[in-house]
Amino acid sequence: MRKLNIWAILLVAIVALASCTQAQQAEKKQIAEHVIYIGLDGWGSYSVDKADMPNVKALMAEGCWTLQKRAVLPSSSGVNWASMFMGACPELHGYTTWDSSKHEIPERVILKNNIFPTMFQLLRDAQPEAEIGCLYEWDGIKYVVDTLSTNYHAQTPKGKEYTDELCKMSVQYIKEKKPVLGAFIFDNPDHVGHDAGHDTPEYYANLKELDGYIGEIIQATKDAGIYEKCIFIVTSDHGGIEHGHGGKTLEEINTPFIIAGKGIKKGGEMQVSMMQFDCAPTVLEIFGLEGPQVWVGRPMLEVFE
């Protein structure tokens, strides 16, 4: 009789645990209606303390941040933007170099659109009517975004006369379309880092200029009437040292990740470890979604209220 009672108790406990798990899954809700995702190519964490970036530092003060998000190796653009958007390491998504325009290793999984699953694709599947856009300066971005899952993607014209063009295009897009997910990827301070050098007066002058653009993008959400419904993310693919990157120094692999807005704690510096491929799962968490099994990234749950 005693054994039967024990088994009965265990059965009740198992059923209760299963019910709780199902309830937790059912309660997973969207945290914010809009995500504004801003990327600065070549922005190393080493520069943040010294940089004159009042808009970025206001986001840091109002939200959560880490200066120890690590890039995947090599610490170059294509492979890291891919890892950021695809929630996985190069061995899985197959993009392995700075200028990858297609996979060099066969993708472990392709769900649709002939590309490894991206955060854009998974949001599109969950919200077929959502406005999703990606605007960028470097043409390599279009190869890792899954443009078929966006409503709008566009590259800015090239040339010094178009320095502020991405900012203008981003502001117009936000005001007109109020994107559910809008990604705006600047190709600086990377160029300045290559030309004048990292950790130079020219590099910091460029960061100040980029911070002004970030301020205009934030203002655009206010003008569009969506500011209170937004989460803002500002991050980078890699840093740099002297005139380059691609190596293993902390100056090259430590990148900022800053998140603020609706439903985000005013928590200051994050205490958890973060990798490049944790960005996409964190974005999906905002929309109440989970990544596919093939993703290795984890959502940064610490940042949410």
Predicted regions and their residues:
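Structural recognition of the beta-strand scaffold that forms the well-ordered cores
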Residues: V35-G39, T66-R70, S83-F85, L122, ...
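Bacterial N-terminal signal peptides that target proteins for export
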Residues: M1-I9
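C-terminal motif of bacterial Sec signal peptides marking the signal peptidase cleavage site
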Residues: A18-S19
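Active-site His/acidic residue clusters
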Residues: D139-A154, K168-G212, E216
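Metal-dependent active-site segment of extracytoplasmic phospho-/sulfohydrolases and closely related
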Residues: I36-Y37, N55, E209-L250, V283
